[in-house]
């Protein structure tokens, strides 16, 4: 195979255009991790041979690796039409759905892969992980067992079994499996960080909180080292610096133009579900999603063009404030077109955009959607910071800054301060939703939220846990959500009081602001 790849690359270098040779040259680049160089070769190969299933499949995979999963889907569907009994395009289509957070669609494609090729150990491993996320531990063990029988070194299958063992409180079995994984010097950085986090969860479950904290810290350090080149000195404006710049601008900006509410009868009622990560936005989003008149969009970036033009440039806010309303229409259309592309219809009475960190984009929301309502979720700041430290997120520049307790506390303070500033200066239609109140008084608090959204309380909203057990949800705590309402994590920060002590002064004003007692 290596010889064939080399021949393909040499032919490409000489300008010889044959689809199979171009495909081989592209594969060589992709194996080297250079999908950018592979992409034009595969495009040309498709032009020369538009019905070649192998070329279409490789192009689809290349698009996934370039983070262009939505484009990849149509290409992979074309590959499947040409060769419906091939497992490869179905597997790559599953990877595209995973990248898009469409985990139920990912599961369906993986099941098709296994139906076509029962010994596909990678598909079995991913099915095991999805089952663990749903708390379906019987399916987890079945899929993982089959994967490991075919490929004893299949790391995702081992990780899935660990998740099932932790969920079943079989901490000793989970520890033994994790110790073996962590001894593997070839374990890649992402899986090592995940294994360290899971070891922390094992120790946390056993009440060994000081040891658990050291594991979480080790996981953060692994991620920090691994992503240092990409995010450590990216040259981008940091999340906190951006918020400080926005707040500085609005300290002297006239309020009138940013308060231009139309009070039009909106169809649908447009709502932004904001807060800070790990504050309870996911739980509330899933509760709202059970209502027949509410559609919830989960963390999809539909404002990226407006961010590019008005938030990133230093003079962007001044430009945004000066634009007449009609000049903003293309950005509104772009927002809704992106929502439709993600599969949302916006045809129900209420459309909820759940985007916790979009709290920093309140200026855009105010100008583009002046009649939007804001559901602002908050939770004990100490539990929020601890939860962020214990969980792993898809890495971004913002998340890279949140790999230490100091970094999380600083980002929290900046974002909450910005939200408070906007409340005081600008007229926002805001409902404050306290996470602990939703847990303690579910029905009455849900009724209050429904009243704010102009819909009646619906009994189906209680069934979020059963929906989570059937569906896969693209969030770090999907397994917790599948267990239903639980107050066991409330006040969990007390178990890590000593470790959190250095950041307590930074969090104290916010504990007081939201009414959480010192002890």
Where do the PLM segments sit?
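Alpha-helical solenoid repeat scaffolds of the TPR/TPR-like class and their adjacent stem/linker regions
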Residues: 1-342
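PAPS-dependent sulfotransferases, especially Golgi type II membrane carbohydrate sulfotransferases
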Residues: 143, 172-182, 186, 193-267, ...
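Short beta-strand segments
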Residues: 273-275, 286, 298, 350-355, ...
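Conserved nucleotide-binding/hydrolysis micro-motifs of P-loop NTPases
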Residues: 301-302, 381-384, 438-439
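Glycine-rich phosphate-binding loop used to anchor ATP phosphates in small-molecule kinases
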Residues: 334-364
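Conserved coil-to-alpha-helix start sites within the AMP-binding
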Residues: 359-362, 383-384, 416
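Short gly/Ser/Thr-rich phosphate-binding loop of adenylate-forming enzymes
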Residues: 362-365, 437, 443
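Conserved phosphate-donor/acceptor-positioning beta-strand/loop module used by diverse small-molecule
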Residues: 365-388
């Amino acid at each position: 195979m290596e010889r064939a790849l080399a021949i393909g690359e040499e032919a490409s270098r000489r300008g010889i255009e044959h689809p199979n040779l171009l495909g081989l040259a592209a594969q060589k680049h992709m194996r080297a991790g250079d999908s950018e160089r592979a992409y034009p070769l595969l495009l040309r190969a498709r032009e020369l041979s538009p019905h070649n299933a192998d070329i279409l499949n490789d192009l689809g995979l290349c698009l996934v690796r370039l983070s262009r999963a939505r484009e990849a889907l149509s290409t992979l569907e074309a590959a499947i039409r040409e060769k419906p009994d091939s497992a490869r395009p179905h597997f790559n289509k599953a990877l595209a759905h995973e990248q898009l957070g469409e985990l139920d669609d990912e599961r369906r494609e993986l099941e098709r892969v296994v139906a076509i090729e029962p010994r596909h150990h990678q598909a079995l491993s991913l099915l095991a992980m999805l089952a663990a996320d749903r708390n379906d531990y019987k399916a987890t063990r079945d899929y993982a067992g089959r994967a490991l029988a075919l490929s004893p070194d299949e790391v995702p299958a081992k990780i899935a079994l660990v998740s099932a063992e932790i969920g079943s409180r079989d901490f000793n079995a989970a520890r033994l499996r994790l110790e073996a994984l962590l001894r593997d010097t070839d374990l890649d950085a992402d899986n090592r960080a995940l294994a360290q986090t899971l070891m922390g969860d094992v120790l946390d479950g056993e009440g060994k909180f000081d040891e658990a904290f050291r594991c979480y810290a080790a996981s953060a350090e692994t991620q920090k080292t691994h992503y240092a080149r990409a995010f450590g000195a990216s040259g981008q404006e940091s999340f906190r610096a951006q918020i400080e710049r926005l707040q500085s601008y609005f300290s002297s900006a006239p309020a009138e133009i940013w308060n231009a509410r139309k009070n039009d009868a909106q169809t649908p009622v447009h709502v932004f579900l904001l807060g800070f990560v790990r504050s309870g936005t996911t739980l509330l989003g899933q509760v709202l999603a059970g209502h027949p008149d509410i559609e919830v969009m989960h963390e999809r970036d539909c404002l990226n063009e407006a961010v590019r033009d008005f938030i990133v440039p230093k003079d962007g806010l001044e430009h945004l404030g000066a634009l007449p309303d009609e000049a903003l229409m293309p950005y509104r259309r772009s927002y809704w077109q992106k929502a439709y592309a993600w599969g949302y219809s916006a045809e129900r009475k209420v459309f909820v955009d759940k985007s916790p960190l979009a709290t920093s984009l309140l200026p855009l929301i105010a100008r583009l959607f002046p009649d939007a309502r804001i559901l602002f979720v908050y939770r004990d700041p100490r539990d929020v910071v601890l939860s962020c430290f214990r969980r792993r997120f898809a890495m971004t520049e913002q998340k890279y800054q949140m790999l230490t307790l100091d970094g999380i506390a600083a980002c929290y303070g900046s974002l909450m301060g910005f939200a408070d500033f906007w409340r005081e200066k600008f007229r926002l239609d805001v409902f404050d939703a306290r996470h602990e109140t939703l847990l303690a008084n579910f029905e009455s608090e849900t009724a209050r939220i429904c009243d704010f959204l102009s819909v009646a309380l619906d009994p189906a909203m209680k069934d979020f846990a059963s929906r989570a057990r059937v569906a896969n949800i693209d969030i770090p705590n999907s397994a917790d959500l599948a267990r239903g309402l639980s107050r066991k994590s409330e006040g969990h920060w007390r178990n890590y009081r000593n470790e959190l002590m250095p950041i307590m002064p930074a969090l104290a004003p916010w504990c007081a602001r939201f009414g959480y007692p010192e002890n």
